[in-house]
Structure formats: C-alpha cells, structure tokens
C-alpha cells in the first residue's frame, strides 16, 4: 500500500524529457512538451513558473506521469520480480497510485527498501505515513488469529476500501470492496448542497439531475457486495 509524496510536483523534468525522447521518435513532440512544461501556470491573473514537476490536472499531465513511471517504476519492477522474487509478486498501478502484493513478507520488506532507493534516483519519495506493509490475503485472518492479533488491516485503492472477507454461501475467501467512507460522505454532502441550491427548480429537472448522479456513482462503485 504505497503513496508517492507530491508526485506531480516532484517529477524531474530532465529525466522526463529523456524518457519522452526514448519513447517518441518525432523530436517535434519533445520540443512541444518542453514548451508546455515551461509555460508556467496562470492563476488569478498571475503567472508562476517552476523548474520541476508537471501541473496536476494539466491536459497532458496524466500521460507524462505514465511515461515517467513506466521507466522509473514499471520496467524496474519487472526486472526485480524476475531476479529477486521467489514467490508470487502482483503489481497494480493506475497513474501514480499503486499496490504491490507479495507471497513472502521478507520479499516485501526487501522490495520496499529497494524501491526507496530506486525512486530517490528519479527525485521521488514514498510518503512515510501513507506507505505501509500489511498482512492481507487468504491466510491473513487465520495467521493473525494464531498470533493473538485482530482482524487483517484494510487498504484503500482507487476509491474502494479493500477488506479480507469470506463468502456467506461457501465460506471461501474473498476480497470485499466498499466505497471509502470519507469519499461517500463527501459525495452525499455535495449532493445535499446541490439539492438545496436547486430547491426551487422544477421537480422533473431535479429528478433528472439526481438520477444522473446516482447512475454515475453506481456505474463505478456498483461492484458485488458493495452496498454503498
């Protein structure tokens, strides 16, 4: 369960341009990206400039972030898994959010130490308070019970809290995914405020808007066993 501290602000532009040039043969693309990075940010009529990072929320920032982490993280992880791991290693990354699962605790600890060094080379740092090694999986509950510990810890990823659970039908292990509580509460508060603002609007219009909100929420969070 990992978090990169201030990722978009920490991107090293020199490394980024090297990665872009390696990935894209057309030099005009590289020059265009270089100009975009150095154009600054206009906010409240004031333009500010920075020598590092890329604007979070910028039109091409997600693309540049993926290019950066492809070289700084993805390719390295593949090599590490092949050369260092004896057990299974599972990696899931979406932009700058990622989780890594290990079969053996010792390999997880070694990977975390190696990852800190790898990221430091490219100006990145794991957030000390948001990066954790937790016991999770099919045998986590039983192993912790034998050691006199409580339930397995949970982790948040891409809007969901992931929980070790068992199916009621057969008792088999499953990963339960529930909407992150704080995110759900924030969304409900947002809807409440908007309904208050629309209180004098025609009911059919309000109903249509509310239906679209509920539909959008359901399309993303509507996974099995998630009641929120």
Describe the residue ranges of each PLM region.
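Non-catalytic terminal/accessory segments
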Residues: 1-228
